[in-house]
Amino acid sequence: MKPTRRALLSAGGASALALSLAACSKSQPKTAQTQASGTPIAEPVLNDKQLSEILQRVQTGLATADKEKNADKLKEVMSGPAARIRAAEYATASASGNNDFIHPMTTTIQGGGVGQTVGFPRNAAAASEGASPSLISLEQNSARDQFKVWAWVQGFSEKKNIPVLTKQSAQRAKQVTADSTGLVSTPKAALDAYVDALNHPDGENGKAFPDDLLRQKVQAARTTNLSSLGEVTVTATAGKDGFQGLQMEEGDGGALVFTTLTYTVVYKRTVDGSDLTLQGDVAALMGGNQKIVGTVTATYDSMVAFSIPKEGSKDKVAVLGAETALIKVDRDDSKTLAPTASASAKPS
């Protein structure tokens, strides 16, 4: 699995994101050098060989955990939202008997990049091969820890339309924060705008972002047909996991940013005596009773990747991909009524 030295180009006219392995040293990382003043010099945290070896280790460990649907084994190769969302996929797959809820993540990379820092945590990113590439964010929390997958997403479009690696255009990258500057938007503002687009699809932000697969999934949930016997409310909120990614200091100067969001789908019975039954992934986590007596609330977590162009660019923030899983289902049976009408609904 030999990574190439090419840059990540985002979709929708967003600026080139230089995830170039030229940002990695050709040799083993050295101890931090210092300037004449004694201030440590930020250096690449990995070289290309090490990044490939890390991703090979991740693929092997993930294959074992996936086969057994063993969330404990994920701790060896995943952390943060990646581990939480993969564990949720295992739970839904086990409850439903359908392994399709465990979505593939490919680590054979086309290209990648690493942050330059003197401290921890340390970040790296990679884009996989394939028609629908995985975009992966890696994190090392301390010198004693292994690099682990902190987040990953599946590209929203085919390879020809979104992240493709075509050329080398940057030598340095700094790690992003929620308030990173030098971009058309801070990462936090980009996430807030996208969450607003999910909540208000006809609003200003709703019109600014393309109709991607996550937006379609949220809208499909919002329009679930309960046959006039109930109502559905969908609400998205920014996640609490923070932000990771790389901001290029040369070339186009854009940033690749990973973060999370949460959305809840509340199914409420509104007609006294009606009988509403849920199907699909939500029903699988409801145990033996799939009926809506009062309300049923499904909570989903999504990892999301953004391309944020350099400040002054005419390009806009683009959403590159997402990975979503059903985290939990809560029910409130405070009103128990005798059924007189019936309907069933399958969440999208």
Label each PLM-derived region with a short phrase.
Residues 13-18:
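Bacterial N-terminal signal peptides
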Residues 21-23:
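C-terminal motif of bacterial Sec signal peptides marking the signal peptidase cleavage site
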Residues 25-27:
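Bacterial signal peptide processing site
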Residues 41-93, 165-233:
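Core segments of small alpha/beta cavity-forming domains
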Residues 131-189, 250, 254-258, 290-345:
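Short beta-strand edge/turn micro-motifs at domain boundaries
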Residues 272-294:
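Mixed-charge, low-complexity intrinsically disordered segments
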